Regions:
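A nucleotide- and high-energy phosphate-metabolite-utilizing enzyme signature
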Residues: 1-179, 183
């Protein structure tokens, strides 16, 4: 149908974005800007946009997809978890890093959804009160508010570590630049 025709016409443009001069540094700067805009009081509670949160997993997967997806069509998937699987299968990210990112992504998504259910509105902040944290603990299979804090801290640190190793790797920028000059 018409939608398929449109997708076929637009797809090459999507996968050529990684060929733009300065694409990798601009993408990195965009992520830094997003984190810098978080209010200081919310920095350690921002599940979606904060350092080590959902966006770090998504930016990591999408950057690698856009850099390598020009050449490798197996990376042209829409969702984050399948993207991480494809990136690991293609050798663009270690299987261990992909598994850690997938596990963290699933947990952070569940936490985000549970918090939204409790508040009956879109929010991406961990509760800042003991009752809210205990309620979240029960909703995600943990026992205490302290356990939520520990798990959140460990998870966000693991994401930040993997994100830093991949997203800021000089190899990613070098590959992007080499593909620009080959194209």
């Amino acid at each position: 149908g018409l939608g398929d025709v449109y997708k076929r016409q637009v797809s090459p443009m999507v996968w050529q974005v990684g060929e733009a001069e300065g694409f990798v540094p601009e993408t990195r700067a965009m992520r830094t800007r997003v984190v810098s805009l978080i209010a200081a009081k919310n920095k350690g509670r921002e599940i979606k946009l904060g350092a080590g949160g959902l966006r770090d997993v998504e930016f990591t997967a999408q950057l690698l997809q856009l850099v390598h997806g020009r050449q490798d069509e197996s990376l042209r998937v829409r969702a984050t978890l399948p993207a991480l699987r494809a990136l690991a299968a293609g050798g663009y990210i270690s299987r261990g890093a992909a598994e850690r990112l997938k596990e963290a992504y699933r947990l952070e998504r569940v936490m985000e959804h549970r918090v939204q259910m409790f508040r009956l509105r879109r929010t991406h902040l961990l509760p800042d009160d003991e009752d809210g944290l205990r309620r979240l603990a029960r909703a995600v299979g943990l026992r205490t508010a302290d356990e939520v804090r520990r798990v959140w801290t460990a998870t966000s640190k693991a994401v930040l570590r993997a994100h830093g190793q991949v997203f800021y790797s000089p190899v990613v920028e070098a590959v992007a630049l080499s593909l620009i000059h080959i194209s």
